[in-house]
Amino acid sequence: MGLLRGGLPCARAMARLGAVRSHYCALLLAAALAVCAFYYLGSGRETFSSATKRLKEARAGAPAAPSPPALELARGSVAPAPGAKAKSLEGGGAGPVDYHLLMMFTKAEHNAALQAKARVALRSLLRLAKFEAHEVLNLHFVSEEASREVAKGLLRELLPPAAGFKCKVIFHDVAVLTDKLFPIVEAMQKHFSAGLGTYYSDSIFFLSVAMHQIMPKEILQIIQLDLDLKFKTNIRELFEEFDSFLPGAIIGIAREMQPVYRHTFWQFRHENPQTRVGGPPPEGLPGFNSGVMLLNLEAMRQSPLYSRLLEPAQVQQLADKYHFRGHLGDQDFFTMIGMEHPKLFHVLDCTWNRQLCTWWRDHGYSDVFEAYFRCEGHVKIYHGNCNTPIPED
């Protein structure tokens, strides 16, 4: 979709209102108003605070105060997605059903490679997405101001003109979220960060760990995605995985497909030769990859076990037990607690996060690499981790 050039078409349409009588012209007027609404909404900025206030007012039944609008596109109805279930996230009756996706999009203004990855991810996601008429796809971006403008440009370029579903975009300021996260994740950063000043040392890369405390309570479920992805199926189908969570499960995540954690847990494995920790599937526990994560925020909020695992003393105890020192942020934390409490996790099929990186095959683990890397079935999401090219269509 190209950029809209101004409000002149809207003004002309409104000027003709008094003269238009026929049903045909009324339809033209409605179309013009829709264009005007999209231009107005596309130029707005909604902050995390204003979104929270609006959600709380809506749930309380009070009329929501005017807030800076989010980029929003309504394209009419669409045939029901296969296997789709109409579920109100508010617990009420029929009405709009929101589906939430979140992506990190920071330091993108002068990063052509990152913009190219985002273009591939968003183009494939939006091209294949199908939602019912009453469903809304909410795209959350965590970014600073410069990257926010880049994201807006990409979305105006990539939102298909005949999408057939409603799409809303919400931007969260990375600095604001970092301030909220730091007190929660400070203690774990030393165990799961590459070092001061490096990519994963920033608190924001532990967002998924504390998302349940950061997002408005009205958001019950959210899917967090990396940008180096390419979608091969309707993203609506991934939300159905929430229905397969067993009691006690709070996060859906795929296995790591390289012997990353065979390496990280080397000392624990040496001391415990019969352990499953770090071993390849299906018998082993290879750890997790955070490129695609389903976060049941309400279950995370209600889990006493998960709350305890966030305590600094608990993190230290497990890190000492497993001699754990990682550099992959939230992925390391989930992997470590998953060794101790696997029932917290719903394991996604590898086809939902088909990782392509083969770095560890060439760095000491060629003899066991295929046992980790093997993935059978039709790929639904490709993950071009460590800058690995993704197959063309």
Swiss-Prot record:
Family annotation (Pfam families): Glyco_transf_8 (PF01501)
Assigned keywords, A-Z: Disulfide bond, Endoplasmic reticulum, Glycosyltransferase, Magnesium, Manganese, Membrane, Metal-binding, Signal-anchor, Transferase, Transmembrane, Transmembrane helix
Topology term for the membrane: Single-pass type II membrane protein
Gene Ontology biological process terms, A to Z: O-glycan processing
Membrane-crossing segments per the record: 24-44
Cytoplasmic domain ranges by topology: 1-23
MF GO annotations: magnesium ion binding; manganese ion binding; UDP-xylosyltransferase activity; xylosyl alpha-1,3-xylosyltransferase activity
Assembly information from the UniProt record: Homodimer. Dimer formation may be essential for the retention in endoplasmic reticulum.
Function: Alpha-1,3-xylosyltransferase, which elongates the O-linked xylose-glucose disaccharide attached to EGF-like repeats in the extracellular domain of target proteins by catalyzing the addition of the second xylose. Known targets include Notch proteins and coagulation factors, such as F9.
Stated family: Belongs to the glycosyltransferase 8 family.
Protein name (Swiss-Prot/TrEMBL): Xyloside xylosyltransferase 1
Origin species: Homo sapiens (Human)
Gene expressing this chain: XXYLT1
